[in-house]
């Protein structure tokens, strides 16, 4: 099937614009996607090459440099008054000529604006001034970008084969000249471990949660039909880290008809600050052992099988099976489900991040169905939200 014509894409843009004005969910994401599609339909190969190999790499490098000299913070602090090249060059420690050349590219790429020799921050650049985004930029430029750059030489050298899961011989190792796994490297490079954690936090920032209105129908699928005589536990967050997701769930649906239980490794649970106001219980659990909480209404996992190979993913899911009450308990997986027909960039981005750094992958719907079937479960439904890479897979006993 041929690509959409510019005229048809413009019609889609107009429709998405009306939805955006009405504050409809997914409209912003649709506008971005259609805008990119319009550019792709209009660009000629020479423009594509310049954009891909000149404009974007230069932008990445300048944005990374900006984190070292606090450029976005200075522009944010200047607010509507802005700052001229001389003032910004002085603040950032650059010579005026160099600053002006770099800043002009930021203007050309719509990151900042300029008028009558004065530079101004934008909503985008002001957002990038936040520390979590500054650290995310450092991780993406210093760690991920070289790993992607190693793709051509690495895959040519290995005969174009997928690296083994958890590899110590992949694009990341090739780019950074190391022979240890990506997680081991992070532990040995504490600043980048912090940058990586900030990146993961920023990756999810501002995106709808699985339990938000319009995503997964919590009231219909969990709250309605809850039976305390079967179990007084409403939700178990398996491998839930320090409790971000389960705390969000509790705050959105308080008062709750049943208990909330967070499970993770001992060192993670012990790192959670004491808080008498929290609505969940925190307990230790190894996901490779049988689930100890029986007959809860739902068992929730957010990106838990995600980092494991298929065999381990099957074991993790199978360990839930003895705890489930047939026809009552639900298994909820908050995971990326890669659409094979119409993949979205947020999903393919993360899939390639996994390939570059760990030899892992994001799974398709067929992949998830296969894993759950092998574990003794069946998919009831897959819920998605417009513009969000992660879906909510609901499963139950087969």
Curated annotation (Swiss-Prot):
Residues that, per the record, bind S-adenosyl-L-homocysteine: 197, 203, 237, 239, 244-245, 264-265, 286-287, 302
Biological process, per Gene Ontology: methylation; mycophenolic acid biosynthetic process; terpenoid biosynthetic process
Binding positions (S-adenosyl-L-methionine): 264
Keywords, alphabetical: Cytoplasm, Methyltransferase, S-adenosyl-L-methionine, Transferase
Compartments where located: Cytoplasm, Cytosol
Coiled-coil annotated spans: none
Presence of the UniProt keyword Transferase in the record: yes
Effect listed in the UniProt record for changing residue 265 to A: Impairs enzymatic activity towards FDHMP-3C, with only 35.6% activity retained, and R265A only exhibited a 0.39-fold decreased activity towards 6-O-desmethylmycophenolate
Residues reported in the UniProt entry to bind 4-farnesyl-3,5-dihydroxy-6-methylphthalide: 144, 199, 303
GO cellular component, one term: cytosol
Domain of life: Eukaryota
Enzyme class: transferase
MF annotations from Gene Ontology: methyltransferase activity; O-methyltransferase activity; polyketide synthase activity
Catalytic activity: (4E,8E)-10-(4,6-dihydroxy-7-methyl-3-oxo-1,3-dihydro-2-benzofuran-5-yl)-4,8-dimethyldeca-4,8-dienoate + S-adenosyl-L-methionine = (4E,8E)-10-(4-hydroxy-6-methoxy-7-methyl-3-oxo-1,3-dihydro-2-benzofuran-5-yl)-4,8-dimethyldeca-4,8-dienoate + S-adenosyl-L-homocysteine + H(+); 4-farnesyl-3,5-dihydroxy-6-methylphthalide + S-adenosyl-L-methionine = 4-farnesyl-3,5-dihydroxy-6-methoxylphthalide + S-adenosyl-L-homocysteine + H(+); 6-O-desmethylmycophenolate + S-adenosyl-L-methionine = mycophenolate + S-adenosyl-L-homocysteine + H(+)
Effect of residue 267 to A: Opens the substrate entrance, and leads to higher catalytic efficiencies towards DMMPA, FDHMP-3C and FDHMP
This protein's pathway: Secondary metabolite biosynthesis; terpenoid biosynthesis
Membership in a protein family: Belongs to the class I-like SAM-binding methyltransferase superfamily. Cation-independent O-methyltransferase family.
Biological function: O-methyltransferase; part of the gene cluster that mediates the biosynthesis of mycophenolic acid (MPA), the first isolated antibiotic natural product in the world obtained from a culture of Penicillium brevicompactum in 1893. MpaG' catalyzes the 5-O-methylation of three precursors in MPA biosynthesis including demethylmycophenolic acid (DMMPA), 4-farnesyl-3,5-dihydroxy-6-methylphthalide (FDHMP), and an intermediate containing three fewer carbon atoms compared to FDHMP (FDHMP-3C) with different catalytic efficiencies.
Subunit structure comment from the entry: Homodimer.
Name of protein: O-methyltransferase mpaG'
Source organism (scientific name): Penicillium brevicompactum
Lineage of origin: Eukaryota, Fungi, Dikarya, Ascomycota, Pezizomycotina
Gene that this polypeptide is encoded by: mpaG'
